[in-house]
Amino acid sequence: MLTIFPFLEWMCMYRLKDWLLGDLLAGISVGLVQVPQGLTLSLLARQLIPPLNIAYAAFCSSVIYVIFGSCHQMSIGSFFLVSALLINVLKISPLNNGHLVMGSFLKDEFSAPSYLMGYNKSLSVVATTTFLTGIIQLIMGVLGLGFIATYLPESAMSAYLAAVALHIMLSQLTCIFGIMISFHAGPISFFYDIINYCVALPKANSTSILLFLTVVVALRINKCIRISFNQYPIEFPMELFLIIGFTVIGNKITMATETSQTLIDMIPYSFLFPVTPDFSVLPKIILQAISLSLVSSFLLVFLGKKIASLHNYSVNSNQDLIAIGLCNVVSSFFRSCVFTGAVARTIIQDKSGGRQQFASLVGAGVMLLLMVKMGHFFYALPNAVLAGIILSNVVPYLETISNLPSLWRQDQYDCALWMMTFSSSIFLGLDIGLIISVVSAFFITSVRSHRAKILLLGQIPNTNIYRSVNDYREIITIPGVKIFQCCSSITFVNVYYLKHKLLKEVGMVRVPLKEEEIFSLFNSSDTSLQGEKICRCFCNCDDLEPLPRILYTERFENKLDPDASSVNLIHCSHFESVNTSQTASEDQVPYTVSSMSQKNQGQQYEEVEKVWLPNNSSRNSSPGLPDVAESQGRRSLIPYSDASLLPSVHTIILDFSMVHYVDSQGLVVLRQICNAFRNANILILIAGCHSSLFCTGITLPDHITKCQQLSLNSLSRLPSFHLQHIF
């Protein structure tokens, strides 16, 4: 119940004494700002919608979002960038030979019956588009498609909101300079509008510029004024006083500046009664409705997540999609345009001390009351004052541009995604930019998962701590053992990169099997497999598991000598002293490996490990393998020989402590890798494997708990541990 109706939760937890004043001031400020914004919407959206229709639709939408919405500071209403996308819809039924689309409104032509019929047709198209947009958003919310927003990182949302802020600033230049230009729609429209502004700049109104600068300076000074009410800081409601003050001055004094009076006088109707949309035009507006639904939905979700992160709470994206879908369905009956989260008013509501959706409810009531009873009083408010209020509140969203150098140093992938999202939203528009942002995020995520981070670990001298060999200069490695740490899940995307990394570090290459060898694998019998003897030492070690029958299509060979196999050492013992070695079997030859460790105060510490190689090659070599054990055993008799200090790799350890998922394809390739390395006499062991990975089909021995609990801190005593491989 609380998920479907989030308002029940905040109503029960509402702090009346602490939050009431802030919500009242924020609601009144938002309501006063929404009145002139609704009056100037027709100028920016290129659609002469009656102001009262916009007011009633905004009021109903605000009430719906208060009931179903999850963002506490969100203000729902018309947003000119979303409404500007309706220009492509208006081309279906061009009004007055394109004068409405190009921005040249001619009131005298409303007397013509054909013009009035075209005007009604355009309103019907807008209403149907809004209705279809709401239906699509409802379907997205019911199907749970809001999860897509969770895959977009913070950098993508910040870049998109920064591009939105720039589009808002560009649109307000009309009100700042008091000039009219022909807005463009589609790709590169941002730069076309800049060129049109530069051409029309000589006709700028100096009074509008002066009023704009006055408002900006007043709001800048207001940033230093704070009101504390019950230990909750509230920003002084300067927007409230600016709107009321300049509205009174505009009604008393005639100022040579642009107002909404001229635009309102051109609208033939003051109010149109609600009607059902015209469903006959649905096939013509499907693509435009999909574009509008995506832009308005993700703008609402991005803005909600941004505001929620500032106040340490979370929003439900699916619930917000359902809420905004209901808002657009209801507003379509009033022949209004598509509604979404109003960026400027949401920021004003947040900065003015709004804590819950009660502020939105107050703002909607104030807006409707003023539009019905005192709407004509705000006709004299200069548009430059409203532009100054809007720009002062959206400028903070551009601060992320100055943080690009630090973002590049922190994460180059996120910085690239930021620049790609921002540039595409500016050059190609918000609709195409949003699609490119989502695709880029998925692409970068795939690239990062493909380039999984795999570290080669070594031991810090005189400790049982293992770290990356690239991070520490004094790292030493266990002779004949390679330790790899996988820092991400293993999937079909990166498992082949893991395979390439293992082969590169071990110094081997993969050689595809011939058809005869593959055929012999299929026809090999169980008796022949049981007859094969695995080379092992004569110490007290547990028996190895039988070789798994896993098909493979390649074998691994050394790069320098393809005919030579790895040293035939799989399990061995670790002896602590020289005396212990004297009790060993006579068939074993000691092989000493010395590694120089860290120098400390002029002293050298030396770690000596003794492992044992088989002396009898006929007993310790498996059938079909080259006879190299004898030569290696004879070479080990040379004391302190340089060649003896470089043992071959006989064991690979995979640290899976950071791996939480292995898909089916990754599991198959891992099995093939283990089998191919085993045939090259290299044993692969897995440490730190989480129990959840065992559900993917890995066959385990009975004593798997020991394998699970084995940590990398015990690798220095690896030969004396009973560590079994699981493949």
Swiss-Prot record:
InterPro entries: SLC26A/SulP_dom (IPR011547), SLC26A/SulP_fam (IPR001902), STAS_dom (IPR002645), STAS_dom_sf (IPR036513). One of its GO terms (molecular function) is sulfate:chloride antiporter activity. Its main location: membrane. Glycans are attached at N120. One of its GO terms (biological process) is chloride transport. Keywords: Anion exchange, Developmental protein, Differentiation, Glycoprotein, Ion transport, Meiosis, Membrane, Spermatogenesis, Transmembrane, Transmembrane helix, Transport. It is a multi-pass membrane protein. It comes from the Eukaryota. Residues 45-47, 96-130, 182-198, 257-283, 382-383, 446-727 are extracellular. N-glycosylated. Residues 1-23, 69-74, 152-160, 220-235, 305-360, 405-424 are cytoplasmic. It catalyses: sulfate(out) + chloride(in) = sulfate(in) + chloride(out); oxalate(in) + chloride(out) = oxalate(out) + chloride(in). Belongs to the SLC26A/SulP transporter (TC 2.A.53) family. Antiporter that mediates the exchange of sulfate and oxalate against chloride ions across a membrane. Stimulates anion transport activity of CFTR. May cooperate with CFTR in the regulation of chloride and bicarbonate ions fluxes required for activation of the ADCY10/PKA pathway during sperm motility and sperm capacitation. May play a role in sperm tail differentiation and motility and hence male fertility. Interacts with RACGAP1. Interacts with CFTR; stimulates anion transport activity of CFTR. This is Testis anion transporter 1. It comes from Macaca fascicularis (Crab-eating macaque). The lineage of its organism: Eukaryota, Metazoa, Chordata, Craniata, Vertebrata.
